[in-house]
């Protein structure tokens, strides 16, 4: 059984994401996945967001558990990926999976016939 970790999303991020999703033309599987993630999220006001939880604009460090490789990225909206160094779009599988996680959480999901598993190592606000 694959139990997903709880996620917390700010109401500001929720509103920005729904605005993007409602107007996005692209990969419907990825859009559906992000809608599913938002459907299971707990929403809080931005000023009440815990510092160790991933939000849009967060700089985060995570590890791919299969390869052991660590990555440091900034979670962005799709149109921001060209202007932000080390950006990861919220519309990528990893970006959507990391939204709302807290430091120490792991998430595992099926992807192209196998499972991907990421562990969130650190978060800082940019």
PLM segments and residue spans:
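N-terminal intrinsically disordered, low-complexity, charge/repeat-rich segments that act as generic
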Residues: 1-53
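Short basic alpha-helical hairpin corresponding to helix-turn-helix/winged-helix-like nucleic-acid-binding
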Residues: 34, 58, 86
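FKBP-type peptidyl-prolyl cis-trans isomerase
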Residues: 54-66, 72-74, 103-124
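Short, acidic/hydrophobic/Gly-rich beta-strand patch recurrent on exposed beta strands
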Residues: 73-77, 87-89
């Amino acid at each position: 059984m694959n139990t997903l970790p709880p996620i917390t999303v700010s109401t500001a991020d929720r509103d920005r994401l729904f605005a993007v999703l409602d107007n996005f033309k692209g990969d419907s599987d990825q859009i559906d996945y992000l809608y599913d993630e938002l459907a299971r999220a707990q929403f809080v006001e931005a000023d009440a967001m815990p510092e160790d939880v991933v939000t849009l604009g967060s700089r985060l460090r995570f590890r791919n558990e299969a390869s052991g490789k660590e990555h440091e990225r900034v979670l962005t909206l799709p149109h921001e990926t060209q202007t932000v160094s080390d950006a990861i779009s919220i519309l990528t599988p990893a970006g959507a999976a990391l939204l709302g996680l807290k430091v120490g959480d792991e998430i595992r999901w099926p992807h192209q016939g196998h499972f991907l598993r990421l562990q969130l190592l650190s978060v800082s606000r940019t």
